[in-house]
Amino acid sequence: MTAYIQRSQCISTSLLVVLTTLVSCQIPRDRLSNIGVIVDEGKSLKIAGSHESRYIVLSLVPGVDFENGCGTAQVIQYKSLLNRLLIPLRDALDLQEALITVTNDTTQNAGAPQSRFFGAVIGTIALGVATSAQITAGIALAEAREAKRDIALIKESMTKTHKSIELLQNAVGEQILALKTLQDFVNDEIKPAISELGCETAALRLGIKLTQHYSELLTAFGSNFGTIGEKSLTLQALSSLYSANITEIMTTIKTGQSNIYDVIYTEQIKGTVIDVDLERYMVTLSVKIPILSEVPGVLIHKASSISYNIDGEEWYVTVPSHILSRASFLGGADITDCVESRLTYICPRDPAQLIPDSQQKCILGDTTRCPVTKVVDSLIPKFAFVNGGVVANCIASTCTCGTGRRPISQDRSKGVVFLTHDNCGLIGVNGVELYANRRGHDATWGVQNLTVGPAIAIRPIDISLNLADATNFLQDSKAELEKARKILSEVGRWYNSRETVITIIVVMVVILVVIIVIIIVLYRLRRSMLMGNPDDRIPRDTYTLEPKIRHMYTNGGFDAMAEKR
């Protein structure tokens, strides 16, 4: 059965390695480097979705029950130092407790002593709106309420025992570690010294040790005692202070050794002071240990860009700061809330983000879809470290090689130049001198005819990419529109032409002018005729439409006729 389990683990590990290799190979890092895009090998992804709770009860004053009050004065002085350290912390906890309304309290026996401890289930915040800090603090208090009885019992037992370490597991499986500081020193050195060296000498040794312990206490828990918020625990200081292996707290964590390493490396073990007991000089800390779950087959790559040259112009490719690659997915990664260890990214949720299709194809090696912007200033990076060497744009920069500062001439058919320790030991870029790694190899992937996408603005990237696609579409449709316009102009009739319209307008204007001239001539002719016959006399032989009878009346025609009769 054991062999079968080991074989299954080996097979799963091999599949994971193969899958990780395939995911890493889908990004052509060599081709992208030719246009100044630098992509690292990537790190795995782990999700910290939940945590385990631990509690540490610190007894800061050792149990001293010497005869004749030996060492009492030194202990009193030591307590005064602790008061100056712990009283402000206790007052802050009291203020925090006052902001939380108790909605569900437990009943206790009337005769039982009321021990001072935070015990409340979160209800409403006194001022109405709960901030995230208040909610976090309230959750810590509510969780501490569940362990109240167990912690109270171990605090009571610590006052009655002379052991330096007590370990208790409560009903829900949460460990409570009790550290009684300096108790071993008192038991092993101070008590024997009283009988050998006398009370005064032993008391002096105790005072020196207490002062030293106070300094070590500030070193180990200074960040935790200085605030009521969450702070990372200093594991090394805690281990050396109490002569114990602090990793014992994590013995029941259901996780692997690599996860424990990542948690320690990123300082994700947080401690919060939840109780200060000035009567017993005990401090209780709530410790949160995150539980990590690795997402198989996922790598997060860190990406960056430097400028490169093509056709005598300097360009810059815009890429996401982090790229998440999965078997069938390639996108961006928002690591704002993530922490980075040496091998992994630890995130509270899946950081995957969608990126435009053109940017995906660019990262996969199709440089014709890469969104670029033209460099107009010197703020764009000109060099970067890759594969133990340096990749630089030596056309837009002044590059030198070796201790003799030999100038580097970059081929204009190449976008960038790759420099390593083999071909250039001391590398200089714009006056900055760099030593390449001796283990770096010469990154020569050959000269490629590079073609990139349309120029865009860097901010915002998504909008610019959409505008770039729209620009390509408009450029393609412009030629088709020109062809359609020519066809329409050829198919149209004669009166649709521009020359015909102009001719018609000119003819109409000429006709209008002629009509006006004719009217003026007729008007002047009639006026001249009226001026030539002022008496309005008309000759007899002149043809007129007026009746002849009128002339008969006017010329005496009727009178002559009457005489004849």
Swiss-Prot record:
Assembly with partners or alone: Homotrimer of disulfide-linked F1-F2. Interacts with HN and M proteins.
Entry keyword annotation includes Oxidoreductase: no
Fusion peptide, as annotated region: 117-141
Protein name in UniProt: Fusion glycoprotein F0
Coiled-coil residue spans: 142-170, 466-491
GO terms, biological process: fusion of virus membrane with host plasma membrane; symbiont entry into host cell
Mutagenesis / variant outcome for changing C338S: Inhibits transport of F and HN to the cell surface
Note, other: Sendai virus or recombinant F protein are widely used in cellular biology to fuse cells.
Subcellular location(s) per record: Virion membrane; Host cell membrane
Topological domain ranges for the Extracellular compartment: 26-500
Membrane topology: Single-pass type I membrane protein; Single-pass membrane protein
